[in-house]
């Protein structure tokens, strides 16, 4: 049954991580128009490259089992391809695709940490520096300090000490912004720009301050839906105990 499902669809989920770190390195503020335009170009290139590769493999190995051109051509993705790369569109028409789906932006929380504390998926920097909780690493008990990869690189490049406060770092590099400081409508706009070129969904969590209201959360979901996002999550700081990532040890949630 599993083999049949795989042959029927051959779904892939090509993605990325380190978006926030890349924007910091390029001096682009997360959520700004320039940052959104840049990420749109990145995702457009990823989509067209993935489609070209899948089409080339279909020429040699055949399409996925459930492939039907009549259904495929109705996809919004194919409307984009027809506009952006007419030659690729015709090749897909002639030869089909090897894979039913191609792109997906996963959270990559653990993967990005293991690769060097890069930012996860398309998320903004959670914190310039933060404490992470673990229960499985030997010789590390409970919580340990982690610096955003791009921030550490900036400090080392400018020969600045790692003991600068977060506020001092932001003052020196004003394009750096933490997730709680990114307006939620800017978060949704960036995700919508990327979603345009992603055939699967995007994992994205809007981190809200403790005083966020139900109306704020409602607006996030409405904006995401209206802009074409396939999914989004809202997390209010302090809404549950034992957060894996802690903003402030002294920050207390309501007991209500």
Where are these regions (language model features)?
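Poly-acidic low-complexity segments
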Residues: 18, 29, 70, 84, ...
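Catalytic alpha/beta core of large soluble enzyme barrels
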Residues: 78, 91-98, 103-255
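Residue-level recognition of conserved structural "scaffold" positions that shape functional pockets
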Residues: 20-22, 34, 116, 128
């Amino acid at each position: 049954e599993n083999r049949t499902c795989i042959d029927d669809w051959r779904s892939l989920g090509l993605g990325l991580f380190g978006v926030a770190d890349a924007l910091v390195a390029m001096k682009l503020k997360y959520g700004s128009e320039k940052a959104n335009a840049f990420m749109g170009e990145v995702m457009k290139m990823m989509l067209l490259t993935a489609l070209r590769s899948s089409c080339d493999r279909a020429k040699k190995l055949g399409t996925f089992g459930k492939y039907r051109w009549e259904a495929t051509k109705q996809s919004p993705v194919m409307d984009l391809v027809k506009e952006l790369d007419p030659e690729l569109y015709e090749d897909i028409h002639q030869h089909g695709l090897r894979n039913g789906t191609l792109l997906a932006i996963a959270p990559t929380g653990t993967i990005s940490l293991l690769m060097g504390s890069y930012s996860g998926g398309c998320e903004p920097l959670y914190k310039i520096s933060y404490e992470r909780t673990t229960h499985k690493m030997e010789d590390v008990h409970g919580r340990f300090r982690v610096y955003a990869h791009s921030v550490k690189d900036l400090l080392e490049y400018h020969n600045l000490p790692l003991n600068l406060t977060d506020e001092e770092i932001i003052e020196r590099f004003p394009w750096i912004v933490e997730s709680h400081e990114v307006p939620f409508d800017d978060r949704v706009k960036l995700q919508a720009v990327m979603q345009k070129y992603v055939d699967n969904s995007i994992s994205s969590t809007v981190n809200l301050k403790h005083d966020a209201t139900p109306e704020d959360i409602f607006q996030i979901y409405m904006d995401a839906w209206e802009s074409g996002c396939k999914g989004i999550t809202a997390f209010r700081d302090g809404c549950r105990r034992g957060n894996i990532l802690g903003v402030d040890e002294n920050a207390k949630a309501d007991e209500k």
